[in-house]
Amino acid sequence: MDWYYPNYTNDMWRILGLCFFGDKLRFVDEAHKTYRLDELKRFLEEVGIAIYDTCLRVRRTTGTASDKDLEVVERADLDGLLRALPQCRGVVAAGQLATSLFTDHYGIDARTMRMGDHCDFTFDGRTVSLYRQPSSSRAFPMRLEQKATYYKSMFEDLGLMASWRPDIL
């Protein structure tokens, strides 16, 4: 896998296009059924969005990518990741497995969190917010525009929308 969310049917990059540009195809290369990775990477760096996995290695127990069919072989160093990102104020764990691994690691009780909610936790003396957002997978039954509304609200809450200028890309 070359990069995050490589599956053309996954909506993560369409969600970001809608949130920041009002254009779900902003990062989509329709002709090649892929994404404009160079532009996407520049955008993420400019805005201050980091992406990482909660698992470094997984084993697929069936032919699907469903969380229930993944066996964790090696977890990521979440503490090391947050230490490497001292300005990080918010985290989205996309998917049930990632959420479970993250909340278990930090002792967060996320059972009562509804879609769009966040809960704060303290890490190395700073407050970090864990956001519960809809999965970007098309298997998650929600319209793309509705998913983008949740994500945009989070980006606004974290101050990323206010500092973003679309003309810089």
Predicted stretch roles:
Residues E46-H105:
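Internal catalytic-core helix/loop-beta-alpha segment
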Residues F20, H105-Y106:
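Active-site catalytic pocket residues across diverse enzymes, especially alpha/beta-hydrolases
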Residues K24-L25, R89-G90, A110:
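Secondary-structure boundary/capping signal
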Residues F20, K24, P86, G159-A162:
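Secondary-structure transition/hinge residues
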Residues R42-L44, A84, F123:
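Generic structural signal for beta-strand residues in well-ordered domains
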Residues P6-Y8, I15, T62-D79, Y106-L169:
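C-terminal capping/extension of enzyme domains
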Residues D2-L70:
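Short, surface-exposed acidic-centric catalytic microdomains
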